[in-house]
Amino acid sequence: MSLPSLDSVPMLRRGFRFQFEPAQDCHVLLYPEGMVKLNDSAGEILKLVDGRRDVAAIVAALRERFPEVPGIDEDILAFLEVAHAQFWIELQ
């Protein structure tokens, strides 16, 4: 696996839907075969994955929103790498 580049534009793969699930009290990814429960960090990242923002814009927005989190850039890139490897997102 390799980290997504900062100019990549992530988007959810076809067939996946991101939403808050009250019954689970967390954000989830729904897809035809099931559901992925997401932790708070993953939910915050995927809120910004809209097929228009590049990775650099997502990182900048989250760094501004959570300035107290050390290493947030690397954490975001690592999550996007995993999400891509799991086929949750595509990178353009």
From Swiss-Prot:
Pathway: Cofactor biosynthesis; pyrroloquinoline quinone biosynthesis. Keywords: PQQ biosynthesis. The keyword Cell membrane does not apply. One of its GO terms (biological process) is pyrroloquinoline quinone biosynthetic process. HAMAP family: PQQ_syn_PqqD. Belongs to the PqqD family. This is PqqA binding protein. The gene is pqqD.
